[in-house]
Each structure stands twice: as C-alpha cells, then as structure tokens.
C-alpha cells in the first residue's frame, strides 16, 4: 500500500506575566504554522549496509529521509537497506543505544554506515518495574528504552507502532490492513502455539489489558523488559516480556498549547493480476471445448463489458489525526492535558474507523516529603462497515455485471455454468454490517512520601473499565438466512500497589532495595443475543425482536491476585553488579 502524508504542526504558546501563577493580566498568543512540502527533486535509489564498531550487521536500524520523515525503511537481518531519496537529500540513520548519524547523499547510490555506541546513554535512568529507577550502567537484565524524542516526528497512530524498528530484539508486525488494527508484539518469541504470546503492558504502574486506544503522542517513554532477570518481578505474567509505558507530565513554567495533525490517503497500488473479461470468456470456451460464450458476447466484453471486481472492492482511503495538548505548571504543581481524534477509511469500501480520547495528568508537591498525582484517560473507538470476502470476489465471474437492469444485485451469471453469483452483497452495508464499539476508562492515583532521605513509601491505586459491543448483521442475500448477533462485554480491573524503597547512592557501594505488596482483581461480564429468520431483510442488529428465532446467553468470570515482592540492586565500585528478586503470589 502507498501512503501519502501531508503534515501540519501548529503551536500556541501562552505567556503569563503574573507572580504565583494567579490569573494573568496579559495573555499573549504566539501562533506558528509549519507546512512541510518536499521539493520535487530527482529521486535515486540508495542501498547500503549498517554495521557496528566490530563489523557486525545491525538489523532493525531506522533509515529516514531527513526532509520527509514519512519516507523511510529499516535494515534487514543482514543490516542491508534500500531507500528512494532525492539526490541531494540527507539520510538519518538511528538505532537505540547508538549515536544517530546524518549523511548527505550527494548523488551516491551506495552508502555504508558504521554506528558508534552512545556511551553517554549509560548514565540515563530507566524504569525497571514498580516505579523503580536505576542507571542503565547498573542494569543486569536486558532492557530496551525508548523516549518520545525517538518517534515524536513520526506520524504514529498507535502506541505499539512506536516499538517498530526502535527496540532491539522486539518483533513488531501488523495483524491487518484495516484502519485501527493492532500490531503483534513478540519480545521473547512464540512461547505457545495456541496460547497468548502478547507481552504484559503496564501504563503508569497500572497493568492494562487494552492499549489500542492510547494516543502515541501522550507517551513520554517506554521500557521493554526482555530477559528472565528483568521480567522476574512480574512473575509468570511477564513470561512473554513486559512493556512499561510512562505518559507525559507537565513542565514548569508558562502554559503551552500545541496542535499537531497529519492527513493522508492510503491506496492499494499493486492489485492481483487478473484476465480481462474478454480473455476470461475466451478461456472458458477453451476449457469447455465448445462455444459456451458466444463470439458476439466476447466482442461486447472487449468493447468494455464485464467487470474487474477489484474496481468495486478498493478505493482511495483518506485518514486524519489531530492532537491538541496543553501543559504547564508552577514550582509545586504541573499538569498535562490532551485530546485526540483519529479518523480513517479502509482501502476496502464500506469500512470506517473513528477514535476519540482525552487525558489529564496532574502532579502536586504538597511539601518537602509528600508528592501526589492523579492520571485520567477516557476513550471511545468505533469500527463500522461491511465484511468483504475479497478472495472469493476476485475469482468471481467477470462476465456478470454487478447489478441487473433493475439496479438489484446480480446474483446469477449471464451464461449457465460460468461463475455462480456475485460478491456485491458481501460489500453492501444493507446486507452485511459489522459494528464494533470500545469504551475505555483508566484512572489512577499515587502518593510518594519520603520517610527519610533514603527511604520512600509509594502507595498507588488504579482502575481500568472496558465496555465492548460487537454487532453483526447478515441478510439472506449473502448466505440464504438473515442473521444478527449482538454481544456486550464489561470488564473492570482494579490494582493497589504499596512499595517501600531504600536507596543509597554511594558511588562505591550503590544499593537499592524494594519491598512490594500488590493486590489485583479483574471481573468480566458478557451478554449475547442472537437472532435469525427475520421476517424481512430491511432489518439490522438493532431490531432483534423482529426475528423468528431468538436466543440469549450470558456469563461472568472473576480473577484475584495478591503478590509480595522483594528486589535488591547492588553496585560495587561501579564495576560489579548484583541483582536478586523473589516473588510470592496467591490467586483465585
């Protein structure tokens, strides 16, 4: 699929001239619009390899056109890449843990790059789970860290997109071409053939079941815990790896409002090659050995009759993403607020996606010892349209026009024995409609209390509420029987975490110990109604009472988990590192 993106960025900066953050006497708006248009320069194909200081190839390195960030690629397992770029353009070569290089193309068609390790990155602080922070140089486990600076210039829709080609050892593949479709994340390979291989997602310390609706622009950083040492603190839930997500907080100083947006279209540029209707008709005669289709009909098809069903399946699909955010604060209080709307059509007709979300993060330093905060997130996504059977439709009889002379779907071939119907009913929402709605609420609070200079108590609690409604309607035009299904699911997840931390930053004997107590509960309820044998096709899944056959079902499930955890990190002379953790849990 070919993706064409035009990006606009608008920033509004509020300047406050008033002490103690009272209501301002003067409010100054500064508006700046940057419209980035790539110049129409000669494009050349540039190939090369990316290696490290030891001459080993580096897979997954991001290669971008510095002037057009929507034009990019990643290196393969051999460190090789190919990209089309203006002859006087600049390549940006980046990978986690290495220094980014910007290379002038200057008409070169072969460019090899050697990346240098980013030594200063070892002093960066990373989150290792349950709010614990240590320097990268003190890590004994395998952790990949990604900050918002690594992807904020990219037109990302989903959080899991940010991991693609940015976290070493993490395989990210898209599950579907449908708008809003998720990504398959594999951190420690496929541990199960039929079971769940997805990693555990933790957002601001709260275990989350669904990250599909979270806005990528709200992310401050992500840490990926990969090996057994890093994931042990989460027990068997971390068997497939753990992704720790930290959302943005406000910055001290003047309030700032920012609007970011991008727009574009998606198109299928390489269709399945098929014969023309006239070639298909001639092939039928050749297959049958007789003139099944008359020469006069073949002449009509050559003049423009018949149909290539792909012309009816595919379309140019527009999409747009708009993010409005505000942040600011004083010495003691900071805030971050954002709203996001993403709309997209699928390249297959009659399929649409719409997502809205809103976030507020507030932190307050009440005194020298106590800091509190609250994070709220609410979202709704709607995926509507018709299910299209492309594989079957493409192979359908091309001699049959989509509709008959009365404008109805043509479900019978013109010539007996040639084809057996029309795929058009599979595309019409009046005959085959699907509607999936997801509502999500995430709310969490925390309190940090410094008992002494070395001992800190952290108490946090959070809840995630998910409501899912999946509806499907299929008329008798599709499979001979009118059917409808409506399924509602409600899930509530609660978590309370209490952590006591002792930390000594002595350069010769750095020591940190954590003791954690955690309680979790998850409850899921569902209701399902099915209906068939409707008295008329002019119905949908909202009129189940008009069906001759009706059935209902319901159920619920409950899970509870209580855990105790102890973890020690010790660094001797900044050379010898020791990490140990033990976890005990009970579940019901």
Task: Please report, for each region that a protein language model flagged, where it lies by residue.
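Short, small/polar-rich motifs associated with maturation and membrane association
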Residues: 1-359, 364-367, 371-379, 442, ...
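Alpha-helical support elements that line or immediately flank enzyme active sites
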Residues: 443-449, 463
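Outer-membrane beta-barrel strand-turn architecture
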Residues: 249, 329-332, 364-368, 449-455, ...
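Membrane-embedded beta-strands of outer-membrane beta-barrel proteins
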Residues: 185, 243, 324, 358-360, ...
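Surface-exposed loop/interface segments of Gram-negative outer-membrane beta-barrel transport/assembly proteins
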Residues: 121, 137, 251-306, 346-351, ...
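Transmembrane beta-strand segments that form the barrel wall of outer-membrane beta-barrel proteins
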Residues: 261, 339-343, 578-588
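Short secondary-structure boundary/capping elements
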Residues: 75, 318, 492, 556-560, ...
